[in-house]
Design a protein with these regions (language model features):
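Compact, glycine-rich, soluble single-domain proteins
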Residues: 7-43, 48, 52-53, 68
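C-terminal structural segments of small proteins and small subunits
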Residues: 51-83
Length: 83
């Protein structure tokens, strides 16, 4: 299991278009992907879950990935969120 704190670099945060791209990327992996903000967590492969967290640019989220392809998933998703 990998767990990382990531500062959101996307100008619009994780709103509809960016959240959809994140879900699309996350869905390519077999690993379990959770996104946490404060005390709340959401399935990283769920558009509604991500949108419910209301993630803005500059906020720090926790990305938790568990599975056999967790290393590749963490690298790609961390790069996506922080750019």
């Amino acid at each position: 299991m990998l767990k990382r704190e990531i500062e959101i670099g996307k100008e619009q945060g994780l709103k509809s278009k960016t959240a959809a791209l994140f879900v699309q990327k996350a869905s390519l992996y077999k690993s379990s992907i959770l996104v946490g903000k404060g005390e709340r967590k959401a399935n990283g492969k769920s558009m509604l879950g991500l949108l419910s967290l209301v993630i803005e640019k500059g906020e720090t989220i926790t990305l938790i990935i568990d599975g056999f392809d967790e290393d590749r998933a963490m690298k790609e998703l961390e790069d996506f969120l922080s750019s």
